[in-house]
């Protein structure tokens, strides 16, 4: 799954998501099966956003949300289930954009905050919250400064978290801190050289 995500192989991600979705449909009371369907649809949505296919991103995110909601209703005590639901809400918000994003923006932050409350030591919980803050405007409780703090917290917990360095770079660039953004992208590429999107972000970020 990560290999296909890193390579932006949408055809493979579509196959994987479709297999796990079919399995989850047959095992409606299996929280883990629901989670895997949510996770694989989230990976597909992530790459669709990266290649600017908003239609597919929204469809995959909304499909995944259905499974994530089911996994949370079956086992509400598992932080990772809340994180993936929040991530999918954030992806749907990012795909829709504008005022339409508000429909999912609150769900993104509420669910990821629940994940952080349940497990405050998991770096990916802060990465997901940071992505939610990145897409939600400051006027609605998000914003790039909060996002930067979340990504820095994830890195403090795990300095080898490539995704945290990658998203820190994206947020720093949005804050017009290009030199720092480049350093973050360079670290992300060093930690995960297979990640196509990280290389693309580095290439398009000016030195100053």
Model-derived regions, located:
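N-terminal leader/linker segments that initiate helical-solenoid repeat arrays
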Residues: 1-46, 51
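Residue-level recognition of tetratricopeptide repeat
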Residues: 5, 39, 46, 87, ...
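Helix-start (N-cap) detector for alpha-helical repeat units in TPR-like alpha-solenoids
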Residues: 31-32, 79-80, 123-124, 162-163, ...
